[in-house]
UniProtKB/Swiss-Prot annotation:
Pfam families: DUF494. PANTHER family: PROTEIN SMG. This is Protein Smg. It comes from the Bacteria. Belongs to the Smg family. It comes from Buchnera aphidicola subsp. Acyrthosiphon pisum (strain Tuc7). NCBIfam families: PRK03430.1. InterPro entries: Smg (IPR007456).
Length: 157
């Protein structure tokens, strides 16, 4: 399922043009590429559930969103998000890329993935996908994109 999310993000979602996508033909295309139908449906369902936040996240952002808080992770969350992942989420909060609300959306979407443990690289993709899909998070998305993809270039110069 995770590979499908990355594939969709790189080939469909991140595309600036807003084309209407026929889910049946998309499912067939993904199946033809070699993805399993069950994983395709799970990935599309994951994205559909993410779209539920599009309407609710912006009004719910409160004045405390920019304050750094300590998130206590449940045992299940700690198993799926290792120390590096939890540290990276805190790092993004400190950079004000994530708010309390977007952090919670990201954690909730991660918990819905059908994987046992997320690695740091996969977490970065999930954060990009979530921020890209929530209206009002464009600035945070671009900050993260610059941080992730321009970091090596900045070191060289």
């Amino acid at each position: 399922m995770f590979d499908i999310l990355i594939y969709l993000f790189e080939n469909y979602i991140h595309n600036e043009s807003r084309i209407s996508i026929d889910y049946d033909s998309l499912t067939n295309d993904l199946s033809d590429i070699g993805f399993q139908r069950r994983d395709i449906y799970n990935a599309l369902s994951w994205l559909k559930n993410l779209s539920c936040y599009k309407k609710n996240i912006i009004p719910s952002i409160n004045p405390l969103s920019n304050k750094i808080t300590i998130r206590i992770y449940t045992q299940e969350e700690s198993l799926k998000l290792n120390v590096d992942c939890r540290g990276f989420i805190l790092f993004l909060e400190q950079l004000e890329i994530l708010t309390l609300d977007t952090r919670e959306v990201i954690i909730e979407r991660i918990m819905e993935l059908d994987i046992n443990e997320l690695n740091l690289e996969d977490l970065k993709w999930i954060v990009l996908i979530v921020l890209f899909n929530i209206p009002g998070c464009e600035s945070a998305y671009h900050k993260l994109e610059n941080l992730l993809f321009n970091f090596k270039e900045d070191i060289i110069h």
